Amino acid sequence: MSERLYIFDTTLRDGEQVPGCQLNTTEKIEVAKLLESLGVDVIEAGFPISSPGDFNSVLEISKAVSEPTICALTRAVKKDIDVAADALRLARRKRIHTGIGVSPQHIYDKLRSTPEKIVESAVEVVKYAKRYVEDVEFYAEDAGRADVEYLARVVEAVIRAGATVVNIPDTTGYCLPNEYGAKIKYLVDNVPNIDRAIISTHCHNDLGMATANTLSGILNGARQAEVTINGIGERAGNTSLEEVVMTLRCHKDVAVDTNINSRLITKASHLVSSLMNMPVQPNKAIVGRNAFAHSSGIHQDGVLKQRQTYEIIDPQDIGLNESVIALTARSGRAALVHRLELLGYDLTQEELDATYEKFLALADRKKEIHDYDLLYLVGDIDRMKQQSISLKFMQVTTGTLVPTATVVLKFGDHERMSTATGNGPVDAAVSAIKKLINEKVVLAEFLMQAITRGSNDVGRVHVQVECGSRTVHGFGAHTDTTRASIEAFLDALRALNVTEKIEEED
């Protein structure tokens, strides 16, 4: 029988620290509800002291989600803990996650302290957090570079103080897998009261070893893994939930498993990618669009004869179903509903109507609609519900002439038209839009990515727009890359809450 590994998802906290990946409270609740359906054990919902928005997100997620434990991060500061406890007051299951740096770099350089004072502070904050909640997790920040004997001393002290989980982070992604695993084993073998707490992994991917280090920790006794959807996270990212879960499913001899419903992995991956404007690289393990693609003739021959020759995971196990019904412009609603149900979506009538309309528009431009197309169509629903600015009409002239664009924007219940030239079709269209808004904005970054294959398939555009001291991100998807670019630009303008420029009277 397999031992239980608890999954601690920090997509909404560590994952959201990535520039441009900030979510509003409504979006965070949407992700949290999907994480609940996915079967995660703990959701780290935010860092309440950091901002009113984070505080409110933790509070609202506590009301919206009932099965997982809701966790709030703090520093080793009593005020942080007070605020976190307040944000968690409505949670059915609650945890405070507090801690302090334990490596020489943190003790001496960052904190200007001593090893003895760090132990005292660690014990003090754990005891203080226990006044509010029974479930207290202690993080030994930068444990990857800490002296292992000192680390064991800190861990023993905080467990004695009441910590129920001890988190051993490789904060900088420094460790080799054998080094990280050895640290976990040392704690298991040398901390007398280690049986009173769960050891947790929290690995960063700076050297590309986050998942390997996490698995090494699990093999040596850790029974909680801190992960994010798609491995999203600060700098080079965190351990990927999907990689840990599916590795354990493939290697049943490890005899450790999770409660994750793996058939929702693809849906979760696309939701997070869409809401956070963070495209998944095509060759990403498990959820990349090439993860189950076979181009070599030898590989294709083997897969056609027996999938297991080159596939160790059944695509259906992560919710990526093979098409039984080919969706085209002639497909009816029943076929679309069936396909969406296989992908894990249960839409309201209003959402289905919006999706079907967009589906038909896309199907008119493509021969067949694939699963990845549907995932992005559904992901667009919430963004399309409330549009203060929308594109009514666009015409672009390019080629050997000076690129010229004419756009018609809809502001509420009326329309405005503008024409401009530029260095290319996108530049011309952006210039035309700028004439119609009341803010001076700069298109600072532009990224285009193909969602599926083929010259007539969907392209996804991500932009970064600056307005004074504010920076926002937007995205758009369309078979017409110029149209996708404009939709992305308008998405960013909506985030800035720009309004219509008032025409000056003569």
Model region roles, listed by residue range:
Residues 1-77, 324-331, 337-339, 343, ...:
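N-terminal capping/small domains of soluble enzymes
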Residues 4-5, 11, 246, 252-419, ...:
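A mid-to-C-terminal "edge-of-domain" accessory segment
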Residues 5-7, 17-42, 56-64, 78-199, ...:
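Alpha/beta enzyme core
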Residues 14, 18-19, 47-52, 103-105, ...:
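Short, small-residue-enriched loops and turns at beta-alpha junctions
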Residues 17, 30-31, 368-484:
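Non-catalytic terminal/interface segments that mediate subunit docking, oligomerization
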Residues 170-171, 226-234, 249-258, 319-325, ...:
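Short beta-alpha connecting loops at secondary-structure transitions
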Residues 175, 182-305:
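Catalytic alpha/beta core domains of metabolic enzymes, predominantly
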Residues 471-473, 477-505:
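Mixed-charge, glycine-accented linear interaction segment located at domain edges/termini
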